[in-house]
């Protein structure tokens, strides 16, 4: 089941929310767990057994690690056992086909008989729920969270359906208190519903429209330079609006149930370095890789060379996490290389001013990386890169011109205009906040009457108007209700676009989120 489907919008979600708010507080986690299992089993019932098995295994390992004591040798042995089993499960389902195909290719080239292996189907969401389980037992070992004895709460954490399929990658230590003490208010529900609608619009209106353009360009056998760059830019925008749209929907659903998940995107395409990009893109994964892989490898301990090596290996393995394809490994190596170079050069990763040249170079590096990330194989990537950097015919091919519609062109323009507007706004807002902190450190700051300011805790990834965050309350000084009209107007616009998106969804074929494949 996916969020952008009629069965979820008009059957599953209304029934679940009705039962959720009619039930007592003590039964809500159990209801959430049951609903999440139904949500997952809607795809395939048989893989639900694997999902439950991984959950129970890590719950038991967590108890063993916790009983052995923080960072003790016995706890380390239990942790190692848990992580090895988790990685073996993930490795088999995600990489068995790739491994056997690679071995068979080598054996065939030597004239040997290849292995016979039935194709292994990848369970949806396995990369996310295995990583979340691993982070839990590591946190118990480190003493960052106690081992929970409540199986229902732990199982609900792993299975909670808003983030189950494609993240954000959550951590038990951040949600443990919310499972027992979360608040449910009309304002919070309204904020969540608005955030959900934002994500739905991103997915259906923008990402799905751009997907047609990207798919067509990447499928061309002889793309022109114009075709290749159009495809690269279309996919760059498609991936952001698709994945950040899913994250918005997940965060919104969480708010509707009283949970507050971490933000997953902070205007990544405004970044002026690859290091800054990874502070803004898929934040839940990048921080997971930092805390559980980079630090485990040694982090910045051991000198400069070891630091560069650990950065590179972390991103290399991060690329492999995305899938069993050499293209993902190269993509990870590409980002790892630039992270190491920026670290070695000592580039300023938190610039105070917006440097167009630095931004353009960073964006170019990101787009180049997305091309191989999107390509089915090295042949497709080579074909696209060859066309992009031949700087030959910038005209679109006849096939492309024949298929490209005015709506698709307009959507691409709107997508990048939106990225530019909110990205620059986010940059200068953050700079003003930093300046404000410096001013408060030097002396008392004064406010002019009638100042409109955002409430602390604004969601950085959400749509903003000056002084407002869609889905959040705003403080107005003085509190004239007239000053709130932009927020209500924006909510009305989002509702209108949401209804239009539902109508568009009904008219198009099924389009899953891109990160479902990972």
UniProtKB/Swiss-Prot annotation:
Functional pathway: Glycan biosynthesis; alginate biosynthesis
Family as reported in the entry's similarity comment: Belongs to the membrane-bound acyltransferase family.
Class of this enzyme: transferase
Molecular function GO terms recorded: acyltransferase activity
Residue segments, region Disordered: 435-456
Keyword Membrane: yes
Residues forming coiled coils: none
Keywords: Acyltransferase, Alginate biosynthesis, Cell inner membrane, Cell membrane, Membrane, Transferase, Transmembrane, Transmembrane helix
Function per UniProt: Together with AlgJ and AlgF, forms an inner membrane complex which probably interacts with the alginate polymerization-transport complex and adds acetyl groups at the O-2 and O-3 positions of mannuronate residues. Acetylation of alginate is important for the architecture of biofilms and increases the ability of alginate to act as a defense barrier.
Keyword Repeat annotated: no
A cellular component annotation (GO) from this entry: plasma membrane
Pfam families for this protein: MBOAT
Topology of this chain in the membrane: Multi-pass membrane protein
BP-aspect Gene Ontology terms: alginic acid biosynthetic process
Catalytic machinery residues: 322
TM regions (residue ranges): 2-24, 39-61, 78-100, 115-137, 150-172, 319-341, 354-373, 402-424, 493-515
Domain of life: Bacteria
Name of this protein: Probable alginate O-acetylase AlgI
Protein localization: Cell inner membrane
EC number: 2.3.1.-
């Amino acid at each position: 089941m996916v969020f952008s489907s009629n069965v979820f919008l008009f059957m599953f979600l209304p029934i679940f929310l009705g039962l959720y708010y009619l039930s007592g507080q003590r039964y809500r986690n159990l209801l959430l767990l049951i609903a999440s299992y139904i949500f997952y089993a809607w795809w395939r019932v048989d893989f639900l057994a694997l999902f439950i098995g991984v959950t129970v295994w890590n719950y038991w390992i967590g108890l063993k690690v916790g009983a052995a004591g923080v960072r003790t040798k016995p706890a380390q042995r239990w942790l190692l056992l848990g992580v090895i089993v988790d990685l073996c499960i993930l490795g088999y389902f995600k990489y068995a086909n790739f491994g056997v195909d690679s071995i068979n290719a080598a054996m065939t080239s030597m004239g040997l008989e290849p292995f016979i292996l039935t194709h292994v189907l990848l369970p949806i969401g396995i990369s996310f729920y295995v990583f979340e389980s691993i982070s839990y037992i590591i946190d118990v070992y480190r003493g960052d969270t106690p081992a929970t004895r409540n199986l229902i709460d732990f199982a609900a954490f792993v299975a909670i359906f808003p983030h189950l399929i494609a993240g954000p990658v959550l951590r038990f230590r951040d949600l443990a208190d919310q499972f027992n003490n979360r608040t449910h208010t009309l304002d919070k529900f309204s904020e969540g519903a608005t955030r959900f609608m934002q994500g739905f619009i991103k997915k259906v209106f923008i990402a799905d429209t751009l997907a047609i353009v990207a798919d067509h360009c990447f499928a061309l056998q002889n793309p022109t330079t114009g075709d290749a760059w159009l495809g690269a830019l279309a996919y760059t925008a498609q991936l952001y609006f698709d994945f950040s749209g899913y994250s918005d929907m997940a965060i919104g659903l969480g708010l509707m149930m009283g949970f507050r998940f971490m933000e997953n995107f902070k205007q990544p395409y405004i970044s002026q370095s690859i290091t800054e990009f990874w502070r803004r893109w898929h934040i839940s994964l990048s921080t997971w890789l930092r805390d559980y892989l980079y630090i485990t490898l040694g982090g910045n301990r051991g000198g400069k060379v070891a630091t560069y090596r650990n950065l590179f290996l972390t991103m290399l393995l991060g690329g492999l996490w995305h899938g069993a394809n050499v293209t993902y490994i190269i993509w990870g190596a590409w980002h790892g290389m630039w992270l190491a170079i920026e670290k070695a050069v000592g580039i300023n990763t938190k610039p105070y001013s917006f440097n167009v040249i630095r931004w353009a170079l960073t964006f170019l590096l990101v787009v180049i990386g997305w091309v191989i990330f999107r390509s089915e194989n090295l042949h497709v990537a080579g074909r696209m890169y060859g066309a992009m950097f031949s700087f030959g015919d910038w005209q679109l091919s006849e096939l492309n011109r024949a298929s490209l519609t005015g709506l698709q062109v307009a959507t691409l323009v709107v997508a990048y205009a939106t990225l530019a507007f909110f990205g620059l706004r986010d940059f200068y807002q953050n700079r003003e906040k930093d300046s404000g902190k410096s001013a408060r450190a030097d002396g008392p700051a004064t406010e002019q009457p009638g100042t409109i300011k955002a409430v602390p805790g604004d969601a950085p990834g959400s749509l903003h108007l000056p002084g407002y965050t869609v889905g959040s309350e705003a403080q107005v000084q003085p509190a004239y209700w007239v000053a709130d009209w932009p927020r209500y107007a924006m909510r009305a616009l989002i509702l209108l676009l949401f209804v239009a998106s539902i109508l568009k969804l009904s008219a198009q074929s099924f389009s899953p989120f891109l990160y479902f494949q990972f």
